[in-house]
């Protein structure tokens, strides 16, 4: 049995050498810097050398004018609305569609920085005192500060006397100033954190 296996292997090696010896002519596609025909289709207008598969498609300039024409005829069926996705456009600085994270025309930072910035705003809110407003606030988000007294634990049982005024309430003032900047902060719990 070893001799037929050797003969089979010799035949396979012979066939493999034939394919190894045959070299196909290498096809040169083009100079690597010559990619205008691929990368810049439609940038300089239609050319005479467009590929045959591109004849079915319209240039981008014609599609823009057609979408403008159809938007004049049928408002609401514009193709541009579909391209923009789910973004909503705001009508003004104090419009209700504008996000509450936008303060004074500045854009909200990324999700990574919001925690750090909130801590900084909390710190600056405690430094600002009780009667000063932060310069970033707009009229829409200004919450008037009122003096709130802490409820004593005895009030739940019916004791009901306010705590003495000499007790420090720095945490409450900080929470109030943070709520003035971020009106949604602390709505879920009374402690704020």
UniProtKB/Swiss-Prot annotation:
Basic and acidic residues: bias regions: 55-67
Keyword Cell membrane: yes
Membrane topology type: Peripheral membrane protein
Tissue: Expressed in flowers and pollen.
Location of the CRIB domain: 29-42
Matching Pfam families: PBD (PF00786)
Biased composition (Low complexity): 123-134
Signal peptide: none
Principal place of residence: membrane
Protein location: Cell membrane
GO cellular component, one term: apical plasma membrane
Composition skew (Polar residues), residue ranges: 90-100
GO biological process terms held by the UniProt record: pollen tube growth
InterPro entries: CRIB_dom
Alphabetized PROSITE patterns for the sequence: CRIB (PS50108)
Segments for region (Disordered): 42-193
This protein's UniProt keywords: Cell membrane, Growth regulation, Membrane
Function: Functions as a downstream effector of Rho-related GTP binding proteins of the 'Rho of Plants' (ROPs) family. Participates in the propagation of ROP GTPase signals in specific cellular responses. Is involved in pollen tube growth regulation through its interaction with ARAC11/ROP1.
Subunit-level organization: Interacts with ARAC11/ROP1.
Any further remark recorded for this protein: Over-expression of RIC5 in tobacco germinating pollen reduces pollen tube expansion elongation.
UniProt protein name: CRIB domain-containing protein RIC5
UniProt organism field: Arabidopsis thaliana
Lineage summary: Eukaryota, Viridiplantae, Streptophyta, Embryophyta, Tracheophyta
Recorded name of the encoding gene: RIC5
């Amino acid at each position: 049995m070893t001799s037929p296996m050797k003969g089979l292997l010799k035949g396979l090696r012979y066939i493999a050498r034939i394919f190894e010896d045959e070299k196909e002519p290498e096809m040169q596609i083009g100079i690597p810097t010559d990619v205008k025909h691929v990368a810049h289709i439609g940038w300089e207008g239609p050319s005479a050398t467009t590929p045959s598969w591109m004849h079915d498609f319209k240039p981008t300039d014609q599609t823009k004018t057609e979408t403008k024409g159809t938007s004049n005829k049928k408002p609401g069926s514009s193709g541009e609305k579909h391209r923009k996705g789910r973004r909503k456009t705001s009508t003004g600085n104090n419009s209700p569609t504008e996000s509450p994270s936008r303060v004074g025309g500045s854009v909200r930072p990324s999700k990574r920085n919001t925690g750090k910035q909130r801590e900084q705003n909390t710190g600056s809110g405690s430094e600002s005192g009780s009667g000063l407003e932060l310069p970033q606030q707009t009229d829409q988000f200004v919450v008037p500060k009122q003096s709130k007294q802490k409820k004593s634990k005895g009030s739940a049982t019916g004791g009901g006397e306010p705590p003495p005024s000499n007790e420090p309430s720095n945490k409450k003032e900080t929470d109030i100033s943070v709520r003035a900047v971020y009106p949604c902060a602390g709505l879920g719990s009374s402690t704020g954190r």
